[in-house]
A protein has these predicted regions:
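Positively charged n-region of N-terminal signal peptides that target proteins for export
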Residues: 1-4
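Sec-dependent N-terminal signal peptides
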Residues: 6-9
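C-terminal motif of bacterial Sec signal peptides marking the signal peptidase cleavage site
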Residues: 15-16
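Residue-level hotspots at or immediately adjacent to binding/recognition sites across diverse folds
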Residues: 19-421
């Protein structure tokens, strides 16, 4: 139907359909008067370490000066934090993280652990800890730290202790419950007549429950809380209900040597999973996500070959041709994506559903799994130059030069917040 701007047809519209603005199109019967809403506008937030001109981060022992932690929104620099002992900010890659619009840092002095936000100290506490989890909830900062002497850990809210373990170590998959409490697993080594064995515990808030496993489980590689657990562990069933374990049972013959299980603690039974082909041993394993679907990874090897197996939600059983477990695994819709250093020289492989989807430019590498960003809009990877040049961003095949010279530490895609919202 053509849009007519003449007076006479417009008058007809006024007569037949009621009062309409002149020139407005009236939908024909049977044609919906709506269109699909556009996707919300997003922007990329990139954090990194920016080094002074001439600094060689491949040979830091010969370099002078110190990097700054930088944060960019698109092409705009919005934050710069100097590092060094005088600022109580470390240049180590794992001692800063981007959360909710802010950069949080942790630092260990000779006597204290110091937590800062955007370069300003929030709190400090006695003892030297490495922060393995930092999260925000209702205006509070939650931390889980491991002692730098290798024994003991503590969970805290705004620096105040909630749970302290004087021995043992945090064992993967720390997170925050829907009720806003820190939840994590830890293991405690115990001497026995057969050697050292491990006892495993689940902690939610200030409550701790031992996880009882069958005696024929010879090794537990990782644990996952249920997707929507109770926010309280006051009852044992609330603390352990739905917890799953990636584990290996004792084997009767060599063909079962690589069979793994996803063991349901509450049900007391496991679901066998195994890599196809003949492999004689399991080299390593981990549970990388406790979100639905559960994502577990392990590597297997034989005399002649090795590979990495990925288990995702009981329906995605993928395998890669190398045994080194890649970094930065993410769910990508119904798929599983990851990154690893390329087998052939420099460059980075993007893995998706068991195959190498793309090999990113030679002369660049990734330094942390947080440099991988997966959203409904696709895959983005922040990459660091191995020759000392500018960092780049790989965005679904398109490569853009970033605004700083240094190491990319995280890439996050967020909705654009307009002024006044």
């Amino acid at each position: 139907m053509r849009k007519l701007i003449f007076l006479l047809p417009a008058a007809a519209v006024l007569t037949c359909c009621g009062l309409k603005e002149l020139g407005e199109i009236v939908p024909e019967p049977g044609i919906p008067d709506y269109v699909d809403p556009p996707l919300p506008k997003t922007e990329l937030v990139v954090t990194g370490l920016e080094y002074p001109e001439g600094y060689d981060w491949n040979r830091p022992e010969t370099a002078t000066g110190a990097p700054d932690i930088v944060m960019y929104r698109g092409d705009k620099l919005v934050l710069r934090i100097p590092t060094g002992d005088g600022y109580s900010v470390s240049e180590d890659l794992d001692m800063h993280r981007y959360i909710g619009g802010h950069v949080y840092t942790d630092y260990s002095s000779d006597t204290h652990t110091i937590v800062s936000r955007d370069g300003l100290e929030l709190f400090r506490y006695q003892g030297r800890e490495r922060i393995v989890l930092l999260a925000e909830h209702d205006g509070h900062v939650l931390t889980l730290g491991e002692s730098r002497d290798g024994r003991g850990f503590s969970s805290r809210v705004d620096g105040v202790p909630v749970f302290i373990g004087f021995d043992g170590s945090v064992f993967q998959n720390a997170g925050v419950s829907p009720g806003g409490e820190l939840r994590f697993f830890y293991r405690l080594p115990v001497n026995s007549t057969s050697g050292v064995i491990y006892l495993y515990y689940a902690v939610v808030g200030a409550d701790c429950v031992m996880i009882e496993l069958p005696s024929d489980i010879v090794e537990a590689y990782g644990f996952a809380f249920p997707e929507t657990p109770s926010s309280s562990a006051a009852e044992e069933t609330d603390a352990v209900g739905g917890i799953k374990v990636l584990c290996r049972r004792s084997v009767k013959d060599v063909q079962d040597a690589t069979q793994m299980e996803i063991f349901d603690v509450d049900a007391g039974e496991g679901k066998p999973v195994r890599a196809s082909g003949f492999f004689s041993s399991v080299r390593a394993g981990t549970v990388l996500s406790d979100a639905a679907p559960l994502l577990a990874v392990f590597s297997v090897s034989s005399l002649f070959s090795s590979r990495t197996a990925v288990y995702s939600g009981a329906r995605c059983w993928q395998e890669w041709s190398r045994s080194d477990i890649p970094t930065g695994f993410r769910h990508l819709g119904d798929s599983v994506a990851g990154i690893r250093k390329s087998l052939y020289g420099s460059g980075v492989d993007i893995l998706c559903n068991g195959y190498v989807r793309d090999t990113l430019p030679k002369g660049y590498t990734t330094m942390t799994g947080a440099a991988l960003c997966c959203t409904s809009r696709g895959i983005k990877v922040g990459m660091t130059s191995t020759s000392g040049g500018r960092a780049i961003l790989w965005n679904e095949g398109k490569v853009d030069s970033l605004m700083f010279r240094g190491i990319v530490t995280s890439v996050t895609e967020e909705p654009v917040v307009l002024e006044g919202e």
